[in-house]
Amino acid sequence: MKLVGMLDSPFVRRTFITARMLGIPFEHQSLSVFRNIPEFRAINPLVKAPTLVFDDGEVMVDSSQIIAWLEHIAAPGKSLWPVDPGRYRRCLQLTSLGLAAAEKSVHRVYETKVRPKECRDPDWLERVDGQIRDTYGLLEA
């Protein structure tokens, strides 16, 4: 298997770390969805990271789906999730908050680093900043 995407993405990074922690062998191909569009499109027309390429050429996208697959193929007893239903539910809740914080942080980067200054929306940025702040507040509670 090959994991495609750059480790500066929180979604690629969480997938990379999960595969390592589960002891699943994989190759990492560091391609940017911004700077390597033709190369990425040849692998995955969606140009979405992370992308997992199976040995048969099939492609899977979305870090949560890839991680679910990695958990499925991991050695018995190797799961990163707790067995207790209450602890499992809490871990899912924390993971959802972490993903929301990562997603909103990526939105902020797009708005402040990628979008031209004359096209930036201060109201949108204020909303995203509030969502980031509130999400981290929930994580720290």
PLM feature spans:
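GST-like domain detector, emphasizing the conserved glutathione-binding G-site
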Residues: 1-124
